Amino acid sequence: MDATIGVTVGDSLDRLEATIDGFDFVEFAIGEGAEPDEVDDERLASILAEAGADLCVHLPFKQDVATHVPEINAGIRDYLGRLLEWAGGVGAEKAVLHGTARNPHDTDLRPIFADQLAAVDAAAADAGVELVVENVGHQARGFPLSVLGDLARETGTAVCFDVGHAYMEDGDDGVDRFCSGYGDLVSHLHVHDVRSRGDTHLPIGAGEVDYGVVSEHFGGFDGTVAVEVFTDDVDMLRDSARRAGTALDAER
């Protein structure tokens, strides 16, 4: 079965409408700057129906999942649960969550993160949405690749593997090691290109990532793949989708 290839659109319905054509789904950002009660649900449904596309969501980018303060952790669970309830109500299939903690290098926080992740995963399941936890180990509050993989396996949580993030953290070798050890957990991919000097979310082919490594591990992948390239140039987005499809043996 071919992978399902979509595009990330941030929190803008205008961008969603302008870029959706030709993609199987969109990944729409919610929370923080785009609270669910501010989203025009009817317009969202109409755009998706007209394009024949599905919906995934991205939970707040800067929201830590775990701290040492129980009251804050409870608030995080409640907040994410509310967003997931909305996501399920509008038919989202998956919800992406950054794998972050107040201090990801504090080993005492790891079991707390595991408990938080399991609770959010359960809330997603109750809403009819699959939670996927994303690697952001190149960022200050992101867990390192292997730690996130271990925590995802411990909690039975699916993974959103961001190829560019993994490269920024540990190069092509890091991509290879994570896929070798945890590839069976991956149901959602973020694809884009990067350069080690700090450029990220570039069109595939414009950076340094060896997508041959991705092909070795995910050839024939039948999950969801989101093109996360920061441009509104539709031709460029479609070219990255084509390149991703080639790497994954998915026809476009």
List each model region and its residues:
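Acidic-and-aromatic substrate-binding clefts and catalytic sites of carbohydrate-active enzymes
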Residues: 8-16, 29-43, 63-71, 102-107, ...
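Active-site acidic/histidine proton-transfer and metal-coordination neighborhood
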Residues: 66-159, 251
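Acidic (Asp/Glu)-rich catalytic clusters
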Residues: 15-22, 37-57, 81-91, 115-126, ...
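Conserved, mostly hydrophobic/aromatic
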Residues: 26, 58, 76, 87, ...
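N-terminal pre-domain/capping segments
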Residues: 1-82, 158
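Short, structured patches in soluble enzyme cores that scaffold and shape functional sites
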Residues: 99, 133-135, 163, 193, ...
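Histidine-acidic metal/acid-base catalytic patches
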Residues: 1-2, 64, 118, 144, ...
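Short loop/turn segments at strand-loop or loop-helix junctions that form parts
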Residues: 58-62, 97-101, 192-193
